[in-house]
Amino acid sequence: MIPAPLDASLLREHAFQGTNDLSTVLSPSTFTDEGGYKPVLKYGLGYFNYGLVIDDEVYDYSVCDIIRGHVYDHFWCYFCCFMILFTIWLISLNWCPSSKKSKFDWSKKKDDFKMEGGDLEYQHVKI
């Protein structure tokens, strides 16, 4: 039976995980001016530009992503709250006792028309 081929990169990575010795993974002779192919067995993982640890989580979320996901998950709750607040706002604009005229009243009231000297005046414009 033929033995499985050895993966030098994997062996060096496991050796580093076990010992935490960086010289196991990156050979000091790696940092030379020689060009060309450098085998992993001889020079280590340094020529792979290989990160030994992941700096960020694989599924790293920003605050914006978290808020958007929360709003999508609870959309109907937020929509109902918005509609209730919008309705209350419209009611307060229309029937607030402090304002004499309704802001959304489309019918003309007697207060809008004034008679001055026989001329009909509508909100300071003579007709």
Curated annotation (Swiss-Prot):
* Protein name, as recorded: Uncharacterized protein YCR043C
The lineage, from the top, is: Eukaryota, Fungi, Dikarya, Ascomycota, Saccharomycotina
Q: GO CC: one term?
A: Golgi apparatus
Source species of the chain? Saccharomyces cerevisiae (strain ATCC 204508 / S288c)
Additional comment: Present with 4240 molecules/cell in log phase SD medium.
